[in-house]
Amino acid sequence: MDFTRRRFLLLTAAASAGTPPAQAGIDHLPIDTTFKNVERYHRIMTKAQAAGWGQIPIGPRMALLGRECLGIAYVGYTLEIDDRVECPSANFDGLDCWTFFEIALGMARLLERPKAVYTPGDLLKEIQWTRYRAGLCTGNYLERIHYLNEWFIDNEARGNVKDITRALGGAVRLKGRESREMTMLWKGYRYLRNNPSLRPQMARIEAKVNELPVWYIPKA
C-alpha cells in the first residue's frame, strides 16, 4: 500500500467517533506479545492530554499524534504476532503505512473520553473495534479485515468513519482490480503459512472483496 500525505489527510478527515463497547477487549495473548513499547505510548498520550488535544477536531488531532510517531522505524508484517491465535496488537517500535494510521486513529478516539491514565488495553480495544469485522475478535485470523475497501465499508456501516471519496468530485469506480495478495503471497503471512486450512477460506473472502465497489480520484 502506497501511503502518501494526501491519503493520510483523507483518512483523518473521514474519521469519526463511534465508541467500542466496553466488552470489546479480549485477552488472547500476553501483553508483551500484543503491545510493544508501552513507554512510548504513555509519553505520547501524556503529552496529548497535557496539551488538550482531545478538544480539537479529530483530523488535526490525528495529524498531531501521527507526528509524535515520526522516527519510528517502518516495519512490515507487525500484525503477524502468533502462529495460530489472532489478537488485537499495537507496535510502537515498528509501523507500516496502515498501522501508522490505525494507531493514530485509536489514540485520537481515546482522547475523546478523558481519563487519568490511558492503558495499553484501552488502545487495544480501540484497535479491535476498527480492525475486525463488526469490531469482534475471538482469536480467528479470518476475523481481521485485510483489505482497505472492506475496512471502509465495515467501519462506515458502524459509524466509525465516513468515506468522502465520491463527495470530493471527480471520483470514478475502479474496474478490473483483483485482490489476491493474501492467497498468492501466503508465505509472507505467518498465520497462513502455519495454517494451510485458512488459505481456501481467505480465497473466498478475497472473492467477496473483489465484488465490493472501489472509488478513487485519478491524478490530473
Where are these regions (language model features)?
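N-terminal export signals
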Residues: 2, 7-24
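Sequence/structural signature of beta-propeller domains
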Residues: 33, 49, 53, 57-80, ...
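C-terminal segment of N-terminal export signals and the immediately downstream linker at the start
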Residues: 20-44
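Active-site-adjacent substructure of cysteine-protease-like catalytic cores
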Residues: 213-220
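Acidic/His-rich structured neighborhood in mature extracellular/periplasmic domains
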Residues: 74-212
